[in-house]
């Protein structure tokens, strides 16, 4: 049983998936595609919650992050406040990188890719 923890995905596996969803959420929001932005954020939150369950040492901070700035982004999407959405994204990235620092992973500095994801039509509604 003690070896099962090593078989479960850790944050090093989960967070790149979160980053991909956040990337898609951001560019969907820039395209004012509420449905796609909302879906991508929901999927990112699901992955973050899974990470918090699988790695309980992160659960309190993950809950705070999801309930705080991520919740603000969700509100911006729901109300189609795209200006607030962009501003909240800047804050979210800063906060995410601050958590990396907190957990001695300051070398992990996430940034939004300069280009939208090529695998989705962000304008489709």
PLM regions: where:
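C-terminal-biased regions
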Residues: 1-125
């Amino acid at each position: 049983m003690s070896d099962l923890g090593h078989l479960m995905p850790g944050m090093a596996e989960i967070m790149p998936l979160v980053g991909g969803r956040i990337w898609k959420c951001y560019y969907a929001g820039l395209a004012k595609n509420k449905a796609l932005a909302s879906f991508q954020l929901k999927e990112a939150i699901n992955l973050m919650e899974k990470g918090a369950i699988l790695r309980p040492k992160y659960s309190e901070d993950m809950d705070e992050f999801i309930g705080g700035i991520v919740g603000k982004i969700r509100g911006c999407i729901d109300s189609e406040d795209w200006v607030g959405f962009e501003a909240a994204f800047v804050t979210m990235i800063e906060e995410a990188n601050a958590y990396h620092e907190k957990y001695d992973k300051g070398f992990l500095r996430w940034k939004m890719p300069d280009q939208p994801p090529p695998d989705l039509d962000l304008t489709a509604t």
